[in-house]
Structure formats: C-alpha cells, structure tokens
C-alpha cells in the first residue's frame, strides 16, 4: 500500500461511511479550469466515409451537434452526478479533430470562478460529446468504440494536474 493512501480518504463519505456532499463553504473562491479528452474510434470504411462527407451524417453536422450536446452536459453535470456542486460555468470550449486515420479526438475545457473544481464537468462534456458522435454515426456501424476518456489537466485547486491548457 502506498504511504499516502493510508491518510487519503474518499471525500464523499462522512465519518460514519455514509455518502455526503463535500462542504466547500470554507474554500477560497479561485479561478478553476479543467480539460478532459475522449476518443471515438471508427472502422476504416466509416472513417473514410466521414472524411469524404466532411463529418456530416444523415442527421446533420456531427461536430456541431457533439459540441452542443457536450456543452449542455457540462451545464447539467450536477444533475447527473449526485455529489457535484452546481457551478456558474464561465466558459466551455471543445476541440474535435482527427487523431489518426480512424480516431476522432474530443477535448473539452471548462472554466469558472468558484470554490470547487470543474473536472467532472469537463469529463462529462467530453463523454457526452463522444456519445453524441456515436449516436450520429450508428446508422453507418455499431462497431465504433469510445475511450479512453480521461482528465488531461486541472488548475486552481489544492493541486494542479497536467500541462496548462
């Protein structure tokens, strides 16, 4: 067992082991940001078709729809994940582009000024954007895969993670 894991504890459990929302009322209000990434992998023929069609499907613009869905998800993260605080989101930006012949890379960066971070919002945005891309393309194939989805960076809390975005 790593030395630091003995003192670490799950923050969403109280002393009795019951689930609870973290009390952030004593935390300082600071600028917070987080970037998350997800990927959608397509079969070669589907990727070629999407490239030829400018990332449009019979349902419409794939990237545009994914950005809208991801943004909506960022703003509603607290409704989806029980112990997330509702946050005043100041910015939400997506980057969606090819990362190889068959993989679309989705990056979601979220910013706010508050007492708690926006990692879950960024992860939720990237995840829902990836799910939306799957939905937009499933008429072409169900052999797509999503992942990995991961936190790339976060700034403004107790500890920063990853490179500044």
UniProtKB/Swiss-Prot annotation:
This is Cyclic pyranopterin monophosphate synthase. GO terms for biological process: Mo-molybdopterin cofactor biosynthetic process. Belongs to the MoaC family. Its EC number is 4.6.1.17. It is an enzyme of class 4 (lyase). The gene is moaC. It catalyses: (8S)-3',8-cyclo-7,8-dihydroguanosine 5'-triphosphate = cyclic pyranopterin phosphate + diphosphate. GO terms for molecular function: cyclic pyranopterin monophosphate synthase activity. Catalyzes the conversion of (8S)-3',8-cyclo-7,8-dihydroguanosine 5'-triphosphate to cyclic pyranopterin monophosphate (cPMP). Pathway: Cofactor biosynthesis; molybdopterin biosynthesis. Keywords: Lyase, Molybdenum cofactor biosynthesis.
